[in-house]
Amino acid sequence: MAFKVVQICGGLGNQMFQYAFAKSLQKHLNTPVLLDITFFDGSNRKMQLELFPIDLPYASAKEIAIAKMQHLPKLVRDALKCMGFDRVSQEIVFEYEPKLLKPSRLTYFFGYFQDPRYFDAISPLIKQTFTLPPPKKIVKKRGRIPPQAFFDFSR
């Protein structure tokens, strides 16, 4: 498998942690990492990471199926899982699992990865990515208020 896939889901905060994990995975494994954004297809939530200059590509349906071994019959997937050859990570929420950033047969990662140790090595890059540009200054026009802007309440 020449790539890894990280599921992006939840609100903006969760998406930011998942993206930071994906970037860290890319750096640690020197492997292409794709983002699975299919969660948003049937959700009221929106993919909000696009507010930032993210640079990881989105995974196609075929790439997701390959990463999750969905191209194999369910019986074969279940047998491989029982033998320890599962390629989908367990859901990770708050705990830190350093083995996830090491080479393994895992190809699909889902969870929230809400521990900064996942991206300590690339912290400056993550901070730069998620720093919003300064707001544009609003230039106030000085001058006379046009007569049509007044309303006479005395009538």
Describe the predicted segments one by one.
Residues 7-17:
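A short, glycine/small-residue-rich beta-strand->loop->alpha-helix junction that serves as a flexible
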Residues 15-27:
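Histidine-anchored nucleotide/phosphate-binding helix
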Residues 31-42:
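A short beta-strand-loop structural module common to alpha/beta enzyme folds
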Residues 46-155:
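Secretory-pathway luminal glycosyltransferase catalytic domains
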